[in-house]
Amino acid sequence: MADSEVLLELSDIKKEYKKGVPALKGVSLSVNKSEVVVILGPSGCGKSTLLRCINGLEEIQSGEITLQGNVINKDKTKWHLIRQRIGMVFQSYELFDHMTVMQNLLLGPLKVQKRDKKEVTEQAEKLLERVGLLDKKNSYPRELSGGQKQRIAIIRSLCMNPEIMLFDEVTAALDPEMVREVLDVMLELAKEGMTMIIVTHEMEFAKAVADRIVFMDSGEIVETNYPLEFFRNPKTERAKKFLNIFNFEKKDKVESALLI
């Protein structure tokens, strides 16, 4: 459960693509320490762009990104230091195919953070054991399933000891059978108090993991609410329409049965 200390704050974030196409239209959001914020919304609404802006992978045109009281988006030369504090996991894993699992895990802490190899190796092995993949430490990514690769990607970020984790549709490329093993890791992180911002289309997972739901549409935050309230009684028509999409199949089956 989140405490009252604000860890990350976004103030009037605006982002435009080429030709003046707006991606984010003045997004403001505060995230408390140990809070899990799940961002929902239709494809193309700016969810992933927002995460990439937080991590410095996309440049914003105006606004401020504040981490623990310090504005982090004004000095571009410090982004390599800031990214060490903000872990990000993508749907495409981003593992180096020519490196073993352990080599992938050690790369950032050793090359970027200049940490002791023995210390990082012990940390990596503990994390691998925790997710049931210690026996894969000498394997290459090509030898792993999609679910295993995504768990390795999460551990790689954790090895950098981040203050906040960003997850961008991490189950989107997985077979249904592999989705649960990845979501279980994220649920455990939430229980342990990791601050997380999660973009997902897994509605049941969102209900289970979120302290707060943020609904976006067309580059703006349209609605924010507690999970139970959001899913039971969304405040905006746009959110209602979005949630009805996920109820369509069930509704269609019921109506078909009534016609028989």
Question: Residues of each region from the PLM?
Answer:
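C-terminal boundary and immediately downstream tail of ABC-type ATPase nucleotide-binding domains
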Residues: 224, 228-260
